[in-house]
Curated annotation (Swiss-Prot):
It holds the Pfam family Pyrophosphatase. Its cofactor is Mg(2+). Substrate binds at residues 30, 44, 56, 142. Belongs to the PPase family. Its EC number is 3.6.1.1. This is Inorganic pyrophosphatase. One of its GO terms (cellular component) is cytoplasm. Its main location: cytoplasm. The gene is ppa. Mg(2+) 1 binds at residues 66, 71, 103. HAMAP family: Inorganic_PPase (MF_00209). InterPro entries: Pyrophosphatase, Pyrophosphatase_sf. It comes from Xanthomonas axonopodis pv. citri (strain 306). Keywords: Cytoplasm, Hydrolase, Magnesium, Metal-binding.
Length: 178
């Protein structure tokens, strides 16, 4: 099945579908899903011996300023299988840039039906500071040993900013679609 058949979400931007590419706490391998075929490719092996602190994926049928779909960090105590789709609520955004330009990461929690443990989280200020520190540390350092690559963190934004980014990314995707 081509992943283009998976929608961005039923009630965007309040609820989004996230295709998982990298499970939480997995080996330091950067996977990327080929959007047309659905195949999971190894993009690269991270040079730093670090594990992703949360499940990492993207929202289908979105297009951000960097030319890629919207990246999403799914806060959940368990790893999810690559290629799985999880319905989430955006609660914040990690503002960052790298050698290729702006590269925001939407922070999301699963909807209550999937995991009720985070049903109370509506905005970034309700996310554990421990989670936020782990995520920030990972993204600030995961490219440290890769030549010509760098990352700069520009702080956190709330749910309203995350939802604005998602809305704009869907509009950009729709305006660029053939």
């Amino acid at each position: 099945m081509g992943l283009e058949l998976v929608t961005s979400g039923k009630n965007l931007p309040e609820e989004i579908n996230v295709v998982i590419e990298i499970p939480k706490d997995s080996e330091p391998v950067k996977y990327e899903v080929d959007k047309a075929s659905g195949a999971i490719f190894v993009d690269r092996i991270l040079s730093t011996p670090m594990r992703y602190p949360c499940n990492y994926g993207y929202v289908p049928n979105t297009l951000c300023g960097d030319g890629d779909p919207a990246d999403v960090l799914v806060v959940l105590p368990l790893p999810l299988v690559p290629g799985s789709v999880v319905r989430c609520r955006p609660v914040g955004v990690l503002r960052m840039s790298d050698e290729a330009g702006s590269d925001e990461k939407i922070l999301a929690v699963p909807i209550e039906k999937i995991f009720s443990g985070y049903a109370h989280i509506e905005d970034i200020n309700q996310v554990s500071s421990h989670w936020m520190e782990r995520i920030g540390h990972f993204f600030e350092h995961y490219k440290d040993l890769e030549k010509g690559k760098w990352v700069k963190l520009d702080g956190w934004g709330g749910a309203a900013e995350a939802k604005r980014i998602l809305t704009e990314s869907v509009e950009r995707y729709n305006s660029d679609a053939p």
